[in-house]
């Protein structure tokens, strides 16, 4: 009889290359795929294919982003790379492609540069939990002491932004040399690539899956079913829900209502359990149709609270991206789209010395909504005005 096919189910991890322009991010990405293709663990994606990244849209913003995938003996990786500096900022803020760990690429010839710092700051703000350093172009530096110096500078930079600078793995090599090396995986030039992959396998832990987090479902729609009660529908963002589970309805006021989900349905069939990613309807015990609305969330008790004021990193769209043509100042009142909630808010605080925000800027700001919404650190949102997206942001701190 035919043998069963052996399917490997390796843990999945999302990573990305970050760092200053021309330090070799795309070259390194290409080199990883080339090396692993020689071991049968990836498809080789050449540099020019990575560099001409396709456009995708996230929260109304166009971003150029390349996705490659590859495997090591231990894991399956999805790896993102962006060609332009602005694309990185937009990606990190919109969370178009989130990272469980980042590979910070620093050229030995330059050391840390302004964008190196900006990417590390953003990675910290959006909570990229782990950082690995690849010091690139080491073949172009004759003095080993200079490379040591660059390593010290990078470790110091990471420590400034609360990464464990002393513990972060630092790999030194040349991505270009690996890319140009012969097709023998044991060739000397691939050593740093293997070291980098080992560091990724061992230093970045398996991420917690969405399904294992506390339950949360943004409410998209509300129905009343005669004789049965009120049903709310939406896509489960995280966790799992079973009939009989207690939940809270949160948002649009400071009052939190407790209820029990008596039935979970998908395509009109009852489910034993709904999990992250499922589009479901939840029947709620003792809740009238007018007591719950779109923009609220259904969540595990105590897992999230309603808030009005928060700090956020925001990217403001350029005119060419369909954004505003003019700057705005403190007191600007656009609409904030947070999950399914659409709520007016005011920019109540800008950094010291910043009087106005120009289209194309990336800035930290304090925002106050007219009513509370379920918000937490790391929450992504869109800013809209007159029916068009003018910005995107990520919550960095909840104030009240």
From Swiss-Prot:
**Segment G5: which positions?**
174-176
Annotated spans, G4:
136-139
List the SUPFAM superfamilies: EF-Tu/eEF-1alpha/eIF2-gamma C-terminal domain, P-loop containing nucleoside triphosphate hydrolases, Translation proteins
Pfam families (alphabetical)? GTP_EFTU, GTP_EFTU_D2, GTP_EFTU_D3
User: What PROSITE patterns does the entry give?
Assistant: G_TR_1, G_TR_2
Q: Where is the tr-type G domain?
A: 10-208
- Region (G1) location: 19-26
Give residues annotated as binding Mg(2+).
26
The UniProt family comment states: Belongs to the TRAFAC class translation factor GTPase superfamily. Classic translation factor GTPase family. EF-Tu/EF-1A subfamily.
**HAMAP family recorded:** EF_Tu_B
Name the record gives this protein: Elongation factor Tu
Organism from which the protein derives: Thermotoga neapolitana (strain ATCC 49049 / DSM 4359 / NBRC 107923 / NS-E)
Q: What is the lineage of its organism?
A: Bacteria, Thermotogati, Thermotogota, Thermotogae, Thermotogales
Q: Which gene holds the coding sequence for this protein?
A: tuf
């Amino acid at each position: 009889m035919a043998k069963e096919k052996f399917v490997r189910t390796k843990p999945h991890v999302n990573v990305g290359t970050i760092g200053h322009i021309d330090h070799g991010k795309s070259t390194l990405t290409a080199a990883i795929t080339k090396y692993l293709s020689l071991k049968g663990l990836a498809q080789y994606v050449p540099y020019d294919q990575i560099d001409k990244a396709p456009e995708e849209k996230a929260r109304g913003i166009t971003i150029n982003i390349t996705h490659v995938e590859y495997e090591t003996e231990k894991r399956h990786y999805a790896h993102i790379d962006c060609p332009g500096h602005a694309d990185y900022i937009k990606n990190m803020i919109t969370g178009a492609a989130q990272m469980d760990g980042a590979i910070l690429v620093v050229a030995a010839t330059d050391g840390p540069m302004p964008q190196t710092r900006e990417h590390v700051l953003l990675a910290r703000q959006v909570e990229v939990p782990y950082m690995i350093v690849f010091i690139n172009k080491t073949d172009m530096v004759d003095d080993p002491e200079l490379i040591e110096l660059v390593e010290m500078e990078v470790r110091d930079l990471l420590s400034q932004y609360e990464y464990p600078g002393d513990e972060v793995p630092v790999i030194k090599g040349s991505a270009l040399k690996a890319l140009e090396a012969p097709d023998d995986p044991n060739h000397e030039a691939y050593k740093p690539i293997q070291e980098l992959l080992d560091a990724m396998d061992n230093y970045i832990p398996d991420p917690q899956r969405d399904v294992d987090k506390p339950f949360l479902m943004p409410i998209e729609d509300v129905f009343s079913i005669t004789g049965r009660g009120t049903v709310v529908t939406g896509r489960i963002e995280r966790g799992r829900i079973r009939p009989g589970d207690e939940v809270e309805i949160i948002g649009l006021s400071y009052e939190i209502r407790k209820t029990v989900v008596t039935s979970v349905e998908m395509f009109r069939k009852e489910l034993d359990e709904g999990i992250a990613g499922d589009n479901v309807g939840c029947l709620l015990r003792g809740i009238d149709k007018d007591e719950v609305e779109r923009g609220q969330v259904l969540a595990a008790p105590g897992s999230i609270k309603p808030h009005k004021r928060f700090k956020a990193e925001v990217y403001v769209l350029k005119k060419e991206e369909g954004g505003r043509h003019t700057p705005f100042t403190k007191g600007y009142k656009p609409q904030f789209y947070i999950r399914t909630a659409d709520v007016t808010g005011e920019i109540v605080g800008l950094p010291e010395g910043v009087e106005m925000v120009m289209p194309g800027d990336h800035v930290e700001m304090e925002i106050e909504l007219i009513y509370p919404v379920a918000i937490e650190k790391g929450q992504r949102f869109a800013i809209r005005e007159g029916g068009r997206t003018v910005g995107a942001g990520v919550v960095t701190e909840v104030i009240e």
